[in-house]
Design a protein with these regions (language model features):
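Conserved GTPase G-domain substructure that encodes guanine base recognition and part of the catalytic core
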Residues: 1-292
Length: 292
């Protein structure tokens, strides 16, 4: 895509200083979609490979196009996002963010990942010269507004919500210095979610991240309510045998004692399932499936 971001687009960037580190940081930036007025279709860029998905009409069950776009963005991005960052002064203060989070909370579970890996939310405000408030009181006000908008528990979709006020703009303070605290907060939040993913064995390599993201894109285009199942997606090219249950029952019928069950049957079944989930060519098959 061009450097100019059209309304409704989300552009993916890599944080340049982290590009060749062991901890590369990806940033997806965009505006809050407002698609109630039809716009012309985007023109494909010649320098980028483009692919499209036709939405199933059942995915557009919300009253407006904007709400439908919100639904799609959240269900697609949430399983792959560490932190959602909103700049309150750019979108009209707290109310638009409250409405958006309330909509997201009402959408239900976006994926089968553990709750501890859910993304965090950071709301950024700008201090004026006469700033007299504090982040804690502003956060309480925000959470009160959110509780009035929805009865859903925030922890259903997000692992935390925080608020950060940036220093007032001054001639002797560079933009880099103003935003240093923001970057530190984002990195700290991301590290916390990353640790949760490590602890639950759901931190994926870049190759698998890309493959799962493409699978999630097709899933979101095809269904409106079912959460994206990472395990099912990983088995697309190696589906579970339909008669697996029968084989397990027959095998266990031959186990006559608790000792045989613990010392023989359970280890054999466990190792067989693990080996079946990781055939020699599964990585290549998953990448080929994504390309197709």
């Amino acid at each position: 895509m061009t450097g100019r971001r059209a309304h409704g687009e989300i552009h993916l960037h890599i944080h340049a200083p982290s590009a060749f580190s062991s901890r590369p940081i990806l940033l997806a930036e965009g505006d809050l979609p407002n698609l109630d007025k039809p716009r012309r279709a985007l023109v494909a860029e010649k320098c980028h490979e483009a692919s499209s998905r036709q939405l199933d009409s059942r995915t557009l069950t919300t009253p407006t196009l904007s709400a439908s776009a919100d639904k799609i963005y959240f269900r697609l991005l949430s399983p792959f996002t560490d932190v959602f960052c909103f700049f309150a002064d750019d979108v009209g203060k707290f109310r638009p963010i409250v409405e958006r989070l309330a909509l997201w909370l009402d959408l239900g579970q976006p994926s089968t990942l553990p709750r501890s890996t859910r993304p965090k939310v950071l709301i950024v405000t700008e201090r004026g010269e006469d700033f007299a408030g504090d982040d804690e009181s502003d956060l309480r006000d925000f959470k009160r507004m959110l509780s009035e908008e929805t009865t859903m528990d925030v922890s259903e979709q997000f692992s935390d919500i925080r608020l950060l006020s940036l220093a007032a703009r001054k001639k002797d303070l560079s933009n880099r210095a103003r935003h240093r605290e923001l970057f530190e907060h984002l990195l700290n939040f991301s590290d916390q979610v990353r640790e949760a993913r490590v602890n639950t064995q759901t931190l994926f390599s870049a190759h698998y991240f890309t493959a799962f993201f493409h699978c999630a894109l097709s899933h979101v285009a095809a269904t409106s309510v079912e959460p994206f199942n990472f395990i099912a997606a990983s088995r697309i090219e190696n589906p579970v045998a339909s008669n697996l249950g029968g084989h397990l029952v027959d095998f266990l019928h031959n186990i006559k004692t608790p000792e045989k069950l613990l010392e023989f049957a359970i280890p054999v079944i466990t190792s067989s399932l693990l080996l079946d989930s990781h055939p020699l060519d599964i990585y290549c098959k998953l990448i080929v499936a994504v390309k197709h």
